[in-house]
Amino acid sequence: MPPSPVENPARRSLLLLGGLAVGGMLAGCAAIQQQNREPTEEPSPEPSRKPERDAPKKPVLYLYPTRTMDLSVSLDYEGTLTYTYPTPQARADGGVTWQVTAAPDGDLTDASGRHYPSLFWEGKGTTILTQDEGFVVEADAATAFLEDKLSTLGLSEREAAEFITFWGPRIAERGRALVTFASEEFARQAIYRFTDPSSGAEIVPDTFIRVYIVVGDAPQTAVREQKLVPAPARTGFTAVEWGGTER
């Protein structure tokens, strides 16, 4: 009588190997069907970080008195200051005051003897400056545009160079930007006061030049071109400020 399949070791091995092979094929088919049913999901891109609105970037203040003099420079800003340099004295009313010695060439010295070319601050505002008008600026025209407009608005070549090296790349990187000069509106948000630290007497600059821009993406529709008023000639004690914000 021949042995049963269960009693045949060779046959038992063949059956076991065959079962494993069939099982592997079935598992592979199931995996392929699962892939066909579930399309691969692409990872979501990182959300782009837009520049903050109403956040002044690098307002800097230059001072050019007719003689070397000690000055208290107070700033009242309609918003929150986020950074200042050099560090001013904080006032109880929320404003700040710098104590400096200013020279006719613009050099500023604090009580420790450290020298500065300007007073710097940044903050977050509470209102939105509009862009109802302005200039549409292409990336390759940003430098020439700024040189021309800053000269009209009264910045010296050194001041303009510092402005352009900060704002030029920010305008150009947009490809096509809308640039609005909002100096008067910003001047109502950031108010300076200059006094003699010894007597407390107010010192009013003979010439105060302020340049503040708003940079945004150029819209598809036409924008009314802004008319700029040329700056007055510099006479006497001159103060100069420039800064801006991005949309």
Q: What residue spans do the PLM features occupy?
A:
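Bacterial signal peptide processing site
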Residues: 30-32
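Protease-labile, long low-complexity intrinsically disordered regions enriched in Pro/Ser/Thr
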Residues: 39-247
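General helical structural elements
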Residues: 15-16, 41
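N-terminal secretory signal peptides
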Residues: 1-10, 16-27
